């Protein structure tokens, strides 16, 4: 007797959930709505200048997606990921061997300067030591383990036709011990 009364009381307190979450009328309206054409998004192979790295932006009153809002290097990275290309080549360097002067570990770079972090050979045998390689000085040796890294420049070739020396800042790289070693010792 007591059990049947509590079951009836609980049933009265429970709210009935609607069978449909939204009305059918709004669903029909959404299905019949015209879709706006998506603005043309340039493919990675179509990007030639910095101006190609500006997105269309969002329509007024809407929240932009990452693709619509991104510009510059961020947009280049997103477009590359959409096509399955790792634009910045974030793979770790070859740690299966020790780099030597005859067979250095290759580091690709699209800029004039590239940093590489050496963790030693075998891997993680010492703390990270950051080495700086430039186009003028593409080979660097780790002072801790002796690993040798070489920068392979893959960026655009220099065009000196319109260069009048305005960018030259007069900085000379400081000399190191390697500058004083005789060539026959290399």
Swiss-Prot record:
GO cellular component, one term: mitochondrial inner membrane
Any matching Pfam family: COX5B
Domain of life of the organism encoding this protein: Eukaryota
Places the protein is found: Mitochondrion inner membrane
Keywords from the UniProt entry: Membrane, Metal-binding, Mitochondrion, Mitochondrion inner membrane, Transit peptide, Zinc
Organelle targeting sequence: 1-31
Gene Ontology MF terms: cytochrome-c oxidase activity; zinc ion binding
Keyword Mitochondrion among UniProt keywords: yes
CDD domains named among the record's database cross-references: Cyt_c_Oxidase_Vb
Residues the entry annotates as binding Zn(2+): 118, 126, 142, 145
Membrane topology recorded in Swiss-Prot or TrEMBL: Peripheral membrane protein
Keyword check for Transit peptide: yes
Pathway: Energy metabolism; oxidative phosphorylation
Gene Ontology BP term (one): mitochondrial cytochrome c oxidase assembly
Family of this protein: Belongs to the cytochrome c oxidase subunit 5B family.
Subunit structure: Component of the cytochrome c oxidase (complex IV, CIV), a multisubunit enzyme composed of 11 subunits. The complex is composed of a catalytic core of 3 subunits Cox1, Cox2 and Cox3, encoded in the mitochondrial DNA, and 8 supernumerary subunits Cox4, Cox5a/Cox5, Cox6, Cox7, Cox8, Cox7a/Cox9, Cox6b/Cox12 and Cox6a/Cox13, which are encoded in the nuclear genome.
Function: Component of the cytochrome c oxidase, the last enzyme in the mitochondrial electron transport chain which drives oxidative phosphorylation. The respiratory chain contains 3 multisubunit complexes succinate dehydrogenase (complex II, CII), ubiquinol-cytochrome c oxidoreductase (cytochrome b-c1 complex, complex III, CIII) and cytochrome c oxidase (complex IV, CIV), that cooperate to transfer electrons derived from NADH and succinate to molecular oxygen, creating an electrochemical gradient over the inner membrane that drives transmembrane transport and the ATP synthase.
Protein name: Cytochrome c oxidase subunit 4, mitochondrial
GN (gene name): cox-4
